[in-house]
A protein has these predicted regions:
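Mature-region segments of soluble proteins
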Residues: 109-111, 122, 139-141
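Preference for long, well-ordered alpha-helical segments
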Residues: 125-144
Length: 144
């Protein structure tokens, strides 16, 4: 009896990338990922539609910024910094304490889409990243 391989849960949120040209390199490496994260959190502070998700974070966003940077580094095909420092991301488990509904997902995406528009000049890459971010954000919903 041949068993089919079981895919890990992380597959649901893994960004497909070419081994020879990962999204991490296409986006511009470490500094570009840091700029994207910084702009994302600036927008979370600025956009009225992001108030509810901003309220889910502590006043000091520095730890959240660093963790998102570490996660995105590996998720985009760069160094797996988050896993090296904190172990497996376990995104769903870590987000379960927060009420993430469609509105929260859409607010998060509004911040990320705008950050992508401002920070990623390649339209095809931007569209690929936006689609993958949406899948991940929707995967984290724990309420309708």
């Amino acid at each position: 009896v041949k068993q089919s391989p079981t895919l890990p849960l992380a597959t649901a949120v893994t960004l497909p990338a070419s081994v020879d040209n990962p999204h991490y390199r296409q986006i511009g490496g470490e500094q570009a990922v840091r700029r994207l994260v910084e702009r994302f959190y600036q927008l979370m502070d600025e956009l009225p539609e992001a108030r509810a998700i901003r309220a889910m974070h502590p006043p000091d966003l520095a730890p959240a910024k660093e963790k998102l940077f570490l996660f995105l580094s590996g998720w985009l095909g760069g160094p797996p910094l988050y896993a090296e420092r904190h172990g497996p991301p376990r995104l769903r488990q870590k987000h379960l304490p927060f009420p993430i509904d469609t509105a929260a997902r859409d607010a998060w995406m509004a911040c990320m889409n705008r950050a992508l528009e401002e920070q990623v000049s390649n339209a095809d890459l931007r569209a690929q990243l936006a689609a993958s971010f949406f899948k991940t954000a929707d995967f984290l919903r724990n309420q309708p």
